[in-house]
Amino acid sequence: MLIYILSGLGVLVGALLGYVVAKRNIEKQLLLAKKDAEHIIKDAEKEASEIKKKAVIESREELHKLREEWEKERKEREEEIRYLEERLIKREEMVSKREELLDKKENYVEELRKELDQRQRDLEAKEKELTERFEKLAGITPAQAKEMVLEEAREKYEYEIAKVYSQIKARYEEDSEKYAKKVIADAIQRYAPEYSGEVTVSTIMLPNDDMKGRLIGREGRNIRAFEKVTGVDLIIDDTPEMVTVSCFNPLRREIAKRTIEKLVADGRIHPTRIEEMYEKAKAEVEKIIREAGQEATFVTGVGGLHPEIIKLLGRLKFRTSYGQNVLNHSIEVALIAGLIASELGVNVEKAKRGGLLHDIGKALDHEVEGSHTVIGAEILRRYGESREIINMVMAHHGEEEPVTPEAVIVAAADALSAARPGARREDVENYIKRLIKLEEIAKSFKYVENAYAIQAGREVRVIVQPDKIDDVLADKLSHDIAIKIEEELQYPGVLKVVVIREKRSVAYAK
């Protein structure tokens, strides 16, 4: 038991001793740490003081440096300002001197002006005096004298001017005619169409003459109903087994012709049946119109047209101009324009498109007011055609200036198609009037003895006085006559003016 107590006391004493020793060690360490901290603080304070001193020194140096730089810049600015002030003073002095010089010049100019005015008045007075003396001596006014001088100069130099004009024209025509002939010949020889002339009547063959009476009907009711529905004249005469449909509108005439053929084939002819067959014939013709328009685009290779434009193209199949079928004419113009464009190296597709559509307005010109070119341009504008194509339509009859080479080509192709022999027919009365007018224009010129229109009005031969007109002036006269014909006369194609100067000398041997 005692052993346990002593052991416990030993442990307790050991613990107390350990505690005391540990406490002393800790206190000793704390004292050392405190001293170290004091040393660190002192070192830090010393270092901070040194840094502060260094910073102050550096700041002072920087401030001094900035002050020196500012002072230097200030001096430079002052020097620059002083220099500018000196320049300004010098410039003001120069301006002042210039003002003085200008004042002197103005005074001098004013004196000169006054002197010139006085001289002008003196000259006018002298001119008036001389004019009065001239009028007294010559007996004519200055205006008359001026006219005499101008007339003398005109007569003197007219020959020289005409000679130079003739030389220039000859050189130009020699080259341009060769090239133009080559282009047109190459185009024409690659396209040679055939045409059959259109007329204003259509004939329908009947199986027998009894059918004529059935077409007339009781008291003429059938023929009256037919003419009312179709808008044509049905001519029934003594010609055996044949009747004639007459109408200026080929479309109505074609529908009427098909209506009669259907009535004859059906055998039942009365007003109601006439109306039924008319509607069927009308539907057939509408189909033909669409097919004709599509065929025209296929033949020419023109694509991308609006369906309504294709339909209007088809209507041209039943439209004529001077006896020429307008659809065939449009196809021909498109193909010729394409060939010429190919020869000249311009846009073939545009030329073909413009050529095919150039007369599209004729499909509606019976129904809408205005020229066919204006109507056609409005149609193409409505269905989205380009401005260039519209210009081709307007320019082919001169209602607009052509803006592209293709527009000029289309106009030329149109003229070629129209001028081709046999392509068109004219009314006899209009034809005769045009020939008379052509000869009158040629005879209106001075020194013309006579004039004759030949070659169906496509050439006029002018006989001149040989002692008044020489070869050079004859060339000028032909040009002047051609210009006047262009201004006063409308005609298809190209018209040739030939001036003939013939000198005959006669002597008799006895």
UniProtKB/Swiss-Prot annotation:
Residues 200-260 form the KH domain. The chain crosses the membrane at residues 1-21. Keywords: Cell membrane, Endonuclease, Hydrolase, Membrane, Nuclease, RNA-binding, Transmembrane, Transmembrane helix. InterPro entries: HD/PDEase_dom (IPR003607), HD_domain (IPR006674), HDIG_dom (IPR006675), KH_dom (IPR004087), KH_dom_type_1 (IPR004088), KH_dom_type_1_sf (IPR036612), Ribonuclease_Y (IPR017705), RNase_Y_N (IPR022711). It is a single-pass membrane protein. One of its GO terms (cellular component) is plasma membrane. Gene3D superfamilies: Hypothetical protein af1432. One of its GO terms (biological process) is mRNA catabolic process. Its EC number is 3.1.-.-. Residues 326-419 form the HD domain. It is found in: Cell membrane. GO terms for molecular function: RNA binding; RNA endonuclease activity. Its main location: membrane. Endoribonuclease that initiates mRNA decay. Belongs to the RNase Y family. NCBIfam families: HDIG, RNase_Y. This is Ribonuclease Y. It comes from Thermosipho melanesiensis (strain DSM 12029 / CIP 104789 / BI429).
